[in-house]
Amino acid sequence: MAKAKFERTKPHVNIGTIGHVDHGKTSLTAAITTVLAKTGGAKATAYDQIDAAPEEKERGITISTAHVEYETKNRHYAHVDCPGHADYIKNMITGAAQMDGAILVVSAADGPMLQTREHILLAKQVGVPAMVVFLNKVDVVDDPALLELVEMEVRDLLLQYGFPAYEVPIIKGSALQALAGKPEGEKAINELMDAVDNYIPHPVRATDKPFLMPIEDVFSISGRGTVVTGRVESGIIKVGEEVEIVGLKETQKTTCTGVEMFRKLLDEGQAGDNVGILLRGTKREEVERGQVLAKPGSIKPHDQFEAEVYVLSKEEGGRHTPFTNDYRPQFYFRTTDVTGTIKLPADKQMVMPGDNATTFTVELIKPIAMQQGSKFSIREGGKTVGAGVVTKINN
């Protein structure tokens, strides 16, 4: 029988498994593909294929991530699973794998553990909009009262981190039973996918967000004016629309008088396009790489913020020594480096290479266009020593 082709007609959603080590994230990922393969919605992917995840580089950081894809009757999913705890932290902080929703896997035998908490916190900070819980390994728990207790603990934890704990679906099952083809195991996987289909909202497409383009290059065309080039990050820009140039200096307003792509004139540029935008009345020296072109009022420049950061270990090419308060590296946002000073929390004397999920405050020497959820790298002497996400703007 010919293999059914994935239809791209269904809405696409990016999802990932999160949770404590050994609670069954990878087994669950394998179980989902195995159960959905029976109805032609996936290619069954074995545990060891997912566990041997290839390494990828994202903003100078090596991350192991496994990608599988599958579909339900309503949606097409791209699913990420990371073998190691540090890979999760790096993945979520760098945004290497953007998640529209997550499946939190908790072992019914152990209940929520340290990494369960860390992953929920990170999901909140990087803006994962919704999650569904899979209470795994229920086949090894005989006492229904214990299951209830674990469920209550999970809801308490979700509540602490600002998720709507009493709305979040919690599905009980066993990934191993599903992999073994047992009916109760498969039933739980189908229930889980129904919950994911119905509870995790449709993602807002990049083209529906306000227009934003990081400026990569600026040049002047004699007789026509100044052109800025870059890849449109979100939204749509049409000829004749007003835009703002934000970051590094005073924000200025200007008008887009032309959009070009591959030397052809367009009426508009949209998310994902590499374009040149002609700006009315703007001088070449008034714009520079590192600023952004944006819909007026949609993004502001800031120079003080709080961040959640992953600091590379020595083995990953990071620093060999810890850093302390007032450390001054470069912060790389989108297309440019800006020097900034790090202020550590009062209870922290230093940050060691390899520390994951570290929180501190940053003060930049120049303001950069940013918002909560903006990603950055920390660089020193041209090499990446960390990656972070803005969790709160302070000014």
From Swiss-Prot:
The chain positions of domain tr-type G read 10-204
Please give the residue ranges the record annotates as the region G4. Answer: 136-139
Query: Which UniProt keywords are listed?
Result: Cytoplasm, Elongation factor, GTP-binding, Hydrolase, Magnesium, Metal-binding, Nucleotide-binding, Protein biosynthesis
The UniProt entry, under CDD domains, shows: EF_Tu, EFTU_II, EFTU_III
Source species, domain of life: Bacteria
Q: Where is this region: G1?
A: 19-26
Question: Residues that bind Mg(2+), according to the entry?
Answer: T26
Q: What ranges does the record give for the region G3, renumbered to this chain?
A: 81-84
Task: Show the GO cellular component annotation of the record.
Answer: cytoplasm
EC number(s) from the headed UniProt entry: 3.6.5.3
Which of this chain's residues are annotated to bind GTP? 19-26, 81-85, 136-139
Locations listed in the record: Cytoplasm
The cross-references to PROSITE patterns, in alphabetical order and at most eight, read:
G_TR_1, G_TR_2
Q: Which GO terms describe its molecular function?
A: GTP binding; GTPase activity; guanosine tetraphosphate binding; translation elongation factor activity
Q: Name the principal localization, coarsely classed.
A: cytoplasm
Annotated region described as G5, given as residue ranges: 174-176
Give the reaction(s) catalysed.
Answer: GTP + H2O = GDP + phosphate + H(+)
Does the keyword Translocase feature in the UniProt annotation?
no
Q: Is the Protein biosynthesis keyword given for this protein?
A: yes
What does the UniProt function comment say about this protein?
Answer: GTP hydrolase that promotes the GTP-dependent binding of aminoacyl-tRNA to the A-site of ribosomes during protein biosynthesis.
Can you tell me which family this protein belongs to? Belongs to the TRAFAC class translation factor GTPase superfamily. Classic translation factor GTPase family. EF-Tu/EF-1A subfamily.
Q: PANTHER family attached here?
A: ELONGATION FACTOR TU, MITOCHONDRIAL, ELONGATION FACTOR TU-RELATED
Q: How does it assemble?
A: Monomer.
Its protein name is Elongation factor Tu
Organism, as annotated: Rickettsia akari (strain Hartford)
